[in-house]
A protein has these predicted regions:
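Non-transmembrane, aqueous-exposed alpha-helical and coiled segments at domain scale
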Residues: 1-204
């Protein structure tokens, strides 16, 4: 907020930071739109799940969390006809990754529709390179404007198949704010992108 020049922008940033503090104290989400529950699960290769299905257990946990936490239920059954709300915001979208070790790690992303609707994907020619990725990211952020719920955290996935690139973009937003990619070259690109995204003037 110290670098924001607009008085209105400064006030909005102050209110956003107050909202962050309140959400942290009350253990509530930043935004009322808790949309689709996206769950990323790292399963250690030495972990043995007994007594039932891991996916069923996750969905029961999501349902209990959304119900007991008074979070908005947005998922409907039979979307082409009756559109009956499931009341539990399930089924969740569950991604499972096998990793070394004997631990289970679960990350929950309550992905609101406002920001999800701004997601973009593009297959580029290899010649587009780093510059092409940069242009695509900047164009996407600029065209999205104020539609995604603030604070806007941009996740970028590069490489692999179409669905894997989108998965990587979603996974990127699970990092702590300010935490960079472990690869130095990628981390430097992130810093460059962040500076250029902030220079667009989108936001307060």
């Amino acid at each position: 907020k110290d670098t924001e020049e607009s008085p209105l922008g400064k006030q909005i940033l102050v209110e956003l930071l107050e909202n962050v503090d309140l959400a942290k104290r009350e253990m509530l989400p930043l935004c009322q739109d808790t949309g689709t529950a996206v769950v990323m699960v790292e399963v250690g290769q030495d972990v043995h799940i007994v007594g039932g299905s891991l996916h069923d257990a996750i969905n029961r946990g999501v349902g209990a969390g959304y119900t007991e936490g008074y979070l908005r239920a947005s998922i409907v059954d039979r979307p082409f006809s009756d559109r009956i709300n499931t009341k539990t915001n399930t089924p969740a979208v569950i991604h499972t990754e096998i990793v070394p070790g004997d631990r289970l790690r679960i990350k929950l992303i309550p992905k609101g529709g406002g920001c999800e609707n701004m997601s973009q994907f593009q297959i580029m020619l290899p010649a587009a390179g780093k510059k092409g990725i940069e242009q695509f990211v900047l164009r996407t952020v600029e065209e999205s404007g104020g539609n995604p719920c603030p604070p806007v955290i941009v996740g970028v996935g590069i490489g692999g198949s179409a669905e894997y690139a989108m998965y990587l973009a979603k996974k990127a937003i699970t990092r702590k704010v300010g935490e960079h990619h472990p690869d130095p070259e990628t981390a430097e690109f992130e810093r460059e992108l962040l500076e250029k995204v902030n220079a667009l003037g989108v936001g307060p």
